[in-house]
């Protein structure tokens, strides 16, 4: 006859936080192994693409990481993707160029 298995925690319902797997112990007993929930991948604030180089962890594990494991060595590392940062830099450069051109045209018209 099959061995009966009961939950090992007080929560008796099949909820998202109470997911289990059946395992066999070295003593040949069958037990429930409680499975931790998966972490979500951090995403870029501008484009929404997953950020590379940053682990997908639950909030508590993520808070335990050291500072350099939570980010990438770049401007806006850990917040924006590389392409989003590149686009911001190019846009800022073009805006500055446009301001300079506008000033030059104003000076030319005053002469």
From Swiss-Prot:
Phosphotyrosine modified-residue sites: 76
Cellular localisation: Cytoplasm; Nucleus, Nucleolus
Keyword Membrane carried by entry: no
A Pfam family matched in the record: Ribosomal_L34e
GO cellular component, one term: cytosol
GO molecular function, one term: structural constituent of ribosome
BP GO terms, sorted: cytoplasmic translation; ribosome biogenesis
Subunit: Component of the large ribosomal subunit (LSU). Mature yeast ribosomes consist of a small (40S) and a large (60S) subunit. The 40S small subunit contains 1 molecule of ribosomal RNA (18S rRNA) and at least 33 different proteins. The large 60S subunit contains 3 rRNA molecules (25S, 5.8S and 5S rRNA) and at least 46 different proteins.
Note: There are 2 genes for eL34 in S.pombe.
Job description of the protein: Component of the ribosome, a large ribonucleoprotein complex responsible for the synthesis of proteins in the cell. The small ribosomal subunit (SSU) binds messenger RNAs (mRNAs) and translates the encoded message by selecting cognate aminoacyl-transfer RNA (tRNA) molecules. The large subunit (LSU) contains the ribosomal catalytic site termed the peptidyl transferase center (PTC), which catalyzes the formation of peptide bonds, thereby polymerizing the amino acids delivered by tRNAs into a polypeptide chain.
Family membership noted in the UniProt record: Belongs to the eukaryotic ribosomal protein eL34 family.
Name used for this protein in its record: Large ribosomal subunit protein eL34B
């Amino acid at each position: 006859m099959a061995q009966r298995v009961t939950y090992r925690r007080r929560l008796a319902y099949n909820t998202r936080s109470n997911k289990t797997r059946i395992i066999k112990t070295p003593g040949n007993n069958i037990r429930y192994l409680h499975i931790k929930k998966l972490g979500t991948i951090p995403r870029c604030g501008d484009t929404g693409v997953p950020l590379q180089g940053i682990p997908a962890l639950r909030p508590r594990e993520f808070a335990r990481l050291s500072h350099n494991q939570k980010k990438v060595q770049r401007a806006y590392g850990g917040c924006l993707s590389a392409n989003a940062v590149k686009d911001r830099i190019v846009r800022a450069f073009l805006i500055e160029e446009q301001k300079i051109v506008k000033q030059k045209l104003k000076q030319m018209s005053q002469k």
